[in-house]
Curated annotation (Swiss-Prot):
Gene source species: Shewanella piezotolerans (strain WP3 / JCM 13877)
Lineage: Bacteria, Pseudomonadati, Pseudomonadota, Gammaproteobacteria, Alteromonadales
Family to which the UniProt record says this protein belongs: Belongs to the SNF2/RAD54 helicase family. RapA subfamily.
Assembly mode: Interacts with the RNAP. Has a higher affinity for the core RNAP than for the holoenzyme. Its ATPase activity is stimulated by binding to RNAP.
E.C. number: 3.6.4.-
Protein name: RNA polymerase-associated protein RapA
Residues binding ATP, per UniProt: 176-183
Keywords noted in UniProt: Activator, ATP-binding, DNA-binding, Helicase, Hydrolase, Nucleotide-binding, Transcription, Transcription regulation
Domain Helicase C-terminal: 491-678
A Pfam family the protein falls into: Tudor_RapA
């Protein structure tokens, strides 16, 4: 290389050093000073990884005195370059020697990097282009926010999330029956609101005992890092902000914290976009005396735009409490309880008409008259005639039914604010089978219980019941906690025999106390060497994950997982179908929670419930009350909460005595009341509301679309290639899983979201659902998003040179492939990306400036190309400069025309969609007051705002590939 003192060069391997100056030459070595960092580097003159920097006419260069020159002429004198052109400050002719160029010059623009010899490997150009295409594909997805979460594709859950998550500031009540996944629905809505920019700051209010469960659920299922706030955390946060709630965007806290006046005031002032309240049915309300908890949530609901209330079904707790929750969502709409009851009467006509449509049979004359009256502002005679015509096309008849059902729903008083699914309306649940295993009461327990009864006569009934339900605890307490009760307890003998007989089965065992769970694990291990693991509240999240993963492993994993009551909250193990209840909780809801660990949508087998109990004891009497009175083992019992409240006094008394007649009376009374409540709930079912809540055929199609995207092999290939380019270590761990590790050779110093100790990932949803320790990789996963951002926000792949070996073309023929990005700067919350996301525009020019991109696809062109080394690539660029400069100008003209078309299409799509939605909501508002004025105003303002953003759309050259034909 011909070096001279004062010449400016740039490092090919360390561009961050800036512009270097040749300051010394001695023998075969050259010294270059990089003034930006103050570093001297010594290079071999023959193999220096340096590129000479020479600008061209039209370029703008900056002097070290910080004035700039627009170059009109380039002169070389004594091996040094002198630039002539227009002075930026005076507007007059000026000259600038290359020695006086600003040493902080960076070559960020692709064409500058190309001419400066900073040329990337060819595969990086391809990865960059694919990254831009993936970002565009995600932004334009109509399912944005639904694919990424690690949840099963359950139609009613996805439907509710799709319907609610797309709204501006949604205010809804999620009131599904237990086991149908309200938490998942809320998580999907939160995830969708965050990804679409509709919400940024979210507050989740939960009972104290559920804070940890929500934290785990949001992280493991939705990749959302919430922070749990308690009083200690609030005090710590003062160092960063006077209002502790401003220190995090995503916060989980308990109602107890917000009962404090100071904390409530801070929460009210924290500018939340969305508030989620779990267990909202515990907010007590009456017109005269609302509870403190209710007032706290009410105050927040007045200042937070979006509100999600998760609650028990309205049937469970009565209409007044149901009205109280609706009042939190829209106090102007639900202002008076008597008026609400009166309005509800009118819903019955709508629901009856919906039943007639939903059953799929011909309509009676009464149903036709009712439908005609309810939809009097429309002529529905054609639809009615089509439904009644048995010879008509079945699909068309069903479509007519769907359309009329939708019309009815729009008139339903709470159709847009209340979602409630019941097991009666949702398919996919397994059968529950109870197997009882009575065991004799050991003499050791009889003696311990007799002594305890004499010593603890002062105990209240609740304490006595807790004791008689857990005789092993009484026995252990008498021996300072060191007694090995499991050596003689017949329930343990039965459990060991059961596990030995069913060695191929996964078995979940639940006990009330962590101590009991630990003792059982010791018994199984020491007596028979049975592989079991424990799961209790004293373990960390990571320890619980490892225990869950060990249990989930098909080969070499634990046969049994032994859980405590609290430790199992929020964890589901659908891959197992055998449940052993080592004892019973004194609460129907807790019993349902236990069974619900296995009895969930997605369970592929019947749930076999095994109950070993001590015969003739309180355990047997409690089992009888649950089984004969509530049928709580083999069916869900929505009225369990009410029945326990009504009969708890008699039940507790019965458990502490041996009075058979009082037990029979209790069972008869409970059974009778259970049937009454069951009939009342069935009659109170609102079929129209259920149709809206589970989505019907529309929900099934939504899930089919999501499932199809899970099978996108092109995405899998693109993501793995992305990790290859970045330098992430990938190790196949079998079972469709890959272990990712940061490597020493990564292109970037850090990869946010990729742990130092690695992460196990899979593209298989079923695998991810069965293993808590494996992340589900979709295009929405933060690791993928971060990878895309690392590439597209850096200079990686912005320049490339390749050779096309094709003897049908003259040697030396030049092609210039340009990737432009069409974009418009706008906040995420504007939703502009739905119409004009960052869009790559590919232009392929021949040397005459003809655009060949329509005829030559990227894939077919890329397959024919071969890479060249950087040294040769730099020479090819230098030799082609005269051809390239005019081609860049032509490329921009073609891209500008494409941008114009994209903008016009985006504007048409936006206007059509938003105008249609605005007109629909205005029409609905005339018949359904649940359409809020805020929604209409927001749509009108959004249209004006989006038009302004579209007017400012612009082009940016993102990447260049120079291709030359070779016959070699």
């Amino acid at each position: 290389m011909p070096f001279s003192l004062g010449q400016r060069w740039i490092s090919d391997t360390e561009s961050e050093l800036g512009l270097g100056t040749v300051v010394g030459m001695e023998g075969r070595m050259v010294t270059v000073l990089f003034s930006a960092t103050g570093e001297n580097r010594l290079f071999s003159r023959s193999e220096a990884p340096l590129t000479r920097v020479i600008f061209n006419p039209g370029d703008k260069v900056e002097s070290h005195d910080e004035w700039s020159l627009t170059v009109t002429e380039v002169e070389e004198k004594d091996n040094l370059i002198i630039y002539h052109g227009i002075h930026s400050e005076t507007g007059e002719q000026a000259s600038l020697r290359e020695t006086l160029l600003n040493h902080n010059i960076r070559f960020n623009k692709p064409q500058d990097r190309l001419f400066a010899g900073q040329i990337d490997r060819m595969d990086r150009f391809g990865v960059r282009y694919q990254c831009q295409l993936l970002r565009n594909k995600l932004a334009t997805s109509d399912l944005l926010g639904l694919q990424g979460p690690r949840v099963g594709l359950i139609p009613h859950q996805q439907w509710i999330a799709h319907e609610v998550g797309q709204r501006f500031a949604p205010r809804v009540l999620l009131a599904d029956e237990v086991g149908l996944g309200k938490t998942i629905e809320a998580g999907l809505i939160i995830h969708q609101q965050l990804l679409t920019g509709r919400a940024e700051r979210i507050l989740v209010i939960v009972p104290d005992t559920l804070r940890h469960q929500w934290l785990v659920e949001m992280l493991r299922r939705f990749n959302l890092r919430f922070s749990v706030f308690d009083e200690d955390r609030c005090v710590e946060a003062y160092a960063d902000n006077d209002n502790p709630f401003y220190t995090e965007q995503l916060v989980i806290c308990s109602l107890e914290l917000l009962r404090k006046k100071k904390r409530l005031e801070q929460a009210l002032d924290a500018d939340w976009d969305l508030m989620v309240v779990d267990e909202a049915h515990h907010l007590e309300w009456s017109e005269d005396a609302p509870s403190r908890a209710y007032k706290v949530v009410e105050a927040l609901s007045e200042v937070v735009p979006g509100v999600l209330l998760l609650t028990a079904t309205p049937d469970q707790l009565g209409h007044q409490s149901h009205f109280a929750r609706l009042r939190l969502l829209d106090p102007d709409r639900f202002y008076d309880y008597p008026s609400f009851l009166k309005e509800e009467e009118s819903y019955k006509d709508v629901a009856t008409a919906a039943d007639a449509l939903a059953c799929g049979e011909s309509l009676s004359s009464e149903a036709i008259a009712s439908l005609t009256q309810l939809l009097s502002e429309k002529d529905i005679s054609d639809s009615i005639n089509l439904i009644q015509d048995a010879s008509a096309n079945a699909d068309k008849r069903n479509q007519a039914r769907e359309e009329l059902l939708q019309e009815l729903l729009d008139r339903h008083g709470t159709g847009r604010v209340l979602y409630r699914n019941s097991r009666a309306s949702v398919k996919g649940f397994p059968t529950r089978n109870l197997h009882i295993h009575p065991q004799p009461m050991p003499e050791q327990y009889v003696t311990a219980s007799r002594v305890s009864a004499m010593m603890n006569k002062h105990l209240d009934t609740n304490a006595k019941v807790r004791q008689v339900l857990s005789p092993e605890k009484i026995y252990q307490d008498f021996d300072s906690g060191s007694a090995s009760w499991w050596k003689f307890d017949p329930r343990v003998d039965w459990l060991i025999d059961f596990l030995k007989t069913n060695r191929s089965k996964k078995v979940l065992i639940i006990a009330s106390q962590a101590e009991t769970a630990l003792s059982l694990e010791e018994a199984l291990r020491t007596r028979e060497g049975i592989q079991a693991t424990v799961f209790h509240e004293g373990m960390s999240i990571i320890e619980r994950d490892k225990a869950g993963a060990y249990f989930a492993q098909e080969t070499g994993g634990a046969q049994a997982l032994i859980c405590s009551e609290i430790g199992s909250e929020g964890r589901n193990f659908q891959f197992a179908s055998h449940l052993v209840l080592f004892d019973l909780p004194l609460n129907p809801d807790l019993l349902e929670q236990r069974i619900g660990r296995l009895d969930r949508i997605g369970q592929k087998n019947d749930v076999e419930i095994h109950l070993p109990y001590l015969a003739g004891t309180a355990q047997e009497r409690l089992m009888q009350w649950y089984h004969q009175g509530l049928n709580a083992f083999e069916c869900t019992c929505p009225s369990g909460h009410i029945l326990f409240g009504e009969f708890s006094g008699e039940l507790l008394e019965t458990l502490t005595t041996d009075d058979e007649s009082s037990l029979e009376t209790l069972l008869d009374n409970t059974k009778s009341r259970y049937q009454e409540l069951k009939v009342a709930m069935e009659q109170g079912r609102d079929k129209l509301l259920e149709i809206n809540s589970h989505g019907g055929e529309r929900a099934n199609k939504l899930v089919e679309s999501l499932a199809a995207r899970d099978e996108d092999t092109q995405l899998i290939g693109s993501v793995i290639r992305l990790w290859d380019i970045i330098g992430v270590e990938q190790e196949d761990s079998g079972e469709n899983a890959i272990v990712l590790h940061p490597s020493e050779h990564m292109m970037f110093p850090t990869y946010p979201g990729l742990p130092e100790d690695g992460i196990t990932v899979t593209f298989d949803r079923d695998m991810a659902l069965s293993r808590d320790d494996i992340a589900l990789i979709t295009q929405e996963h933060p690791i993928v998003q971060t990878g895309l951002d690392l590439i597209t926000s850096s200079e990686t792949g912005t320049t490339s040179v390749a050779v096309l070996k094709n003897k049908a073309l003259p040697a030396g023929t030049v092609f210039l492939e340009l990737i432009y990005m069409a974009d418009a700067s706008a906040p995420k919350s504007s939703q502009l990306y739905r119409y004009l996301p960052p869009t790559p525009i590919r232009i392929l020019l021949d040397k005459s400036g003809n655009n060949l991109s329509d005829n030559v696809t990227y894939e077919s062109f890329d397959r024919q190309l071969s890479a060249v080394n950087r040294h040769i690539a730099s020479k090819l660029v230098t030799a082609s400069q005269a051809i390239l400069h005019p081609l860049f100008a032509k490329g921009e003209t073609f891209a500008a025309n494409e941008l114009k078309l994209l903008t016009e299409t985006a504007r048409e799509k936006m206007t059509q969609q938003l105008t249609g939605e605005l007109e629909r909501l205005k029409a609905l508002k005339a018949v359904n007051p649940n359409i809020r004025d805020e929604e209409l105003t927001h749509l009108s303002e959004q249209m004006s705002e989006l038009n302004r953003y579209l007017d400012s759309s612009q082009l940016q050259l993102d990447a260049i590939r120079l291709v030359l034909v070779s016959h070699a």
